[in-house]
Structure formats: C-alpha cells, structure tokens
Design a protein with these regions (language model features):
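Single-stranded RNA-binding regions, centering on S1/OB-family and related RNA-binding modules
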Residues: 1-106
C-alpha cells in the first residue's frame, strides 16, 4: 500500500469528553493498544464520521481510526496514530483513506 493516509480497524468507545474517543488496536505483536483520539479522527466501520450521539457510555463499536503510514513492510506496517505514538500493526487492518483538504486563509 502506497497511501500516506490510512484507516486502521479498531474498537471505539466514548471518551471522558464529548469530543474524544477511546480506541483499541491490535498490534502486529498480538498485544492490544489503547489510546485516546479526537472524535474527528474516528469513523464508523464503513468510513462515515461518527455522529455526536453514536457512542453511548459503556458501549463499543467496530470502527476505524485515521493514521499516517510511515513504513509498509509487507505484512507489517508502521503507522502514526492520533495520540502521537508510532506503532506496528498487521497490514490486514490497514485500509486507504482520502487525504484531508487543507484550508489556508489568504
């Protein structure tokens, strides 16, 4: 995969604040990684933005988290995730996404 912008399959639940989500990824090592991300980086399983009321307390959905591909090594990819970490994940949980449009004032 040559895309710089990717999605990672994960489990998503509500964070402590209305504009954040808790995500859980499976790492290439088999370990689970739990992090926090702004809601704008989280998507439903089919790639749609999460509605503000889509996550109820104590519920978890299967979804996607936005990430940047750092290195693709075939079966394993190194990605930067929204909480600032770089992790190794199985290439099987990575899917392509469209780059975000930059808005610059003139």
């Amino acid at each position: 995969m040559n895309a710089k912008f990717v999605y990672l399959e994960c489990q998503i639940s509500a964070g402590a604040f209305s504009d954040e989500c808790v995500f859980e990824l499976k790492l290439a090592s088999g370990d689970e990684y739990i992090g926090i991300a702004p809601r704008k980086y989280c998507r439903t399983e089919d790639g749609h933005k999460l509605a503000s009321d889509s996550l109820q307390k104590k519920s978890t959905i299967t979804g996607k988290i936005a990430a940047r591909l750092i290195r693709n090594g075939g079966d394993v990819a190194v990605v930067a995730i929204p909480d600032g970490e770089a992790v190794e994940v199985s290439a099987g949980i990575v899917s392509q996404r469209e780059p975000e449009t930059s808005h610059v004032s003139v």
